[in-house]
Amino acid sequence: MLLGSQTMSIDRFGLLTGTIRLASGVSFLVDPLRANKLWGDPEEPTPTAQLLLRSMGYRDALIGALLAGAALRGKSTRGWFLASAGADVADLVGGMSVHSELKPSQQIIGLGGAAVGIGVGLWGAVRPTTRPATRTVTEEPAP
């Protein structure tokens, strides 16, 4: 450790949330058809919808990886939690615009999942930090 360096413990909630978002994003990249079914759509999506599913996968994988990485390094995760909430707001607003065209399972899983994600992201951004910083001081050896 360097003189006066700050070390913070791992943000477990940030790591868990980031890992879940990363895994969800990767699932949309690896097999968007299966992931789409998990989110409530039993039908095969059109090629345009598959493109959008993959785009959502890249977005979620990126946000999840950066959130988990910050959590592992003991860095602030607030910004990544806000990015996560923002992504879910976009999903919810987009889903609400086609709400009447969605099947009940899509409404519950897709829109409900986005609403939960918004809550998790906002709470993650504003929650009190219980991880105290520990100051490490190393002394130089005497000559």
What are these regions (language model features)?
Residues 1-143:
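Short amphipathic, positively biased membrane-proximal segments
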